[in-house]
From Swiss-Prot:
InterPro entries: Pyridox_Oxase, Pyridox_Oxase_CS, Pyridox_Oxase_N, Pyridoxamine_oxidase_dimer_C, Split_barrel_FMN-bd
One GO-annotated biological process of the protein: pyridoxine biosynthetic process
Biological role stated in the UniProt entry: Catalyzes the oxidation of either pyridoxine 5'-phosphate (PNP) or pyridoxamine 5'-phosphate (PMP) into pyridoxal 5'-phosphate (PLP).
Binding locations of substrate: 8-11, 66, 123, 127, 131, 190-192
Entry-linked HAMAP family: PdxH
Catalysed reaction, written as an equation: pyridoxamine 5'-phosphate + O2 + H2O = pyridoxal 5'-phosphate + H2O2 + NH4(+); pyridoxine 5'-phosphate + O2 = pyridoxal 5'-phosphate + H2O2
Positions with a binding annotation for FMN: 61-66, 76-77, 82-83, 105, 140-141, 184, 194
GO molecular function: FMN binding; pyridoxamine phosphate oxidase activity
Class of the enzyme per the UniProt entry, highest EC level: oxidoreductase
Record keywords, A-Z: Flavoprotein, FMN, Oxidoreductase, Pyridoxine biosynthesis
Gene that encodes it: pdxH
Keyword Oxidoreductase listed: yes
EC number: 1.4.3.5
Protein name: Pyridoxine/pyridoxamine 5'-phosphate oxidase
Length: 214
């Protein structure tokens, strides 16, 4: 087995101070996301989505963020997938963005709601044709007997709908409405900077900021 104990990096690129932090986490996230884009990181919109099933078993996977505003963080998927079933019984989730090149993480927790049909339709129409066909062809997370079966379904959907497949009823968007967002900046000697935004109706910005021990 490969020895792992000595694999480590001493983080030193930047700091995160309360005086420099935006008053609300959406503005802070926008700032960091723009910096990730400017740094030309590969797919900075990738995030880990963690859910819990009816049996209490957690699961996590990488998904793509497709929208962020003051209402929350939006992603799209198959409602009949494992994550879809998890969210149907436990509409709470956690997101994690990890931008290792900038030595940064963003951890987000909150409740899940479906986006409107109009939002889902609008995003679905913007997807490449192959992705729209794939949304029909794939029974996401279901067992299939072979790759050939999947490709046969893809061909059948393409022949049925041509260049204009509608959005499947089992496919659409979710919005995570956060109640806490943590920004993590790596620092030397593992004494990292961690600022936690928590919803607070009494605060002027609607959020309070706390520094967490690393």
């Amino acid at each position: 087995m490969t020895t792992l104990a000595d694999l480590r990096i001493n983080y030193s690129r930047a700091s995160l101070d309360e005086a420099d932090a935006a008053p609300d986490p959406f503005a802070q996230f926008d700032r960091w996301f723009k910096e990730a884009l400017a740094a030309k990181l590969p797919e900075p919109n990738t995030m880990t989505l963690a859910t819990v099933g009816a049996d209490g078993r957690p699961s996590a996977r990488i998904v793509l963020i497709k929208g962020v505003d003051e209402r929350g963080f939006v992603f799209f998927t198959n409602y009949e997938s494992r994550k879809g079933h998890d969210l149907a019984v436990h509409p709470q989730a956690a997101l994690l963005f990890y931008w290792i090149e900038l030595e940064r993480q963003v951890r987000i927790e909150g409740r899940i709601e479906k986006t409107s049909a109009e939002e889902s339709d609008r995003y679905f129409a913007s997807r490449p044709l192959g992705s729209r066909i794939g949304a029909w062809a794939s029974e996401q997370s279901a067992v299939i007997d072979s790759r050939a079966t999947l490709e046969a379904r893809e061909k059948a959907v393409s022949e049925r709908y041509g260049d204009n497949p509608p959005r499947p009823p089992h496919w659409g968007g979710y919005r995570l409405v956060p109640d806490s967002i943590e920004f993590w900046q790596g620092r030397p000697s593992r004494l990292h900077d961690r600022l936690l935004y928590t919803r607070d109706a009494a605060a002027a910005s609607g959020w309070t900021i706390s520094r967490l021990s690393p």
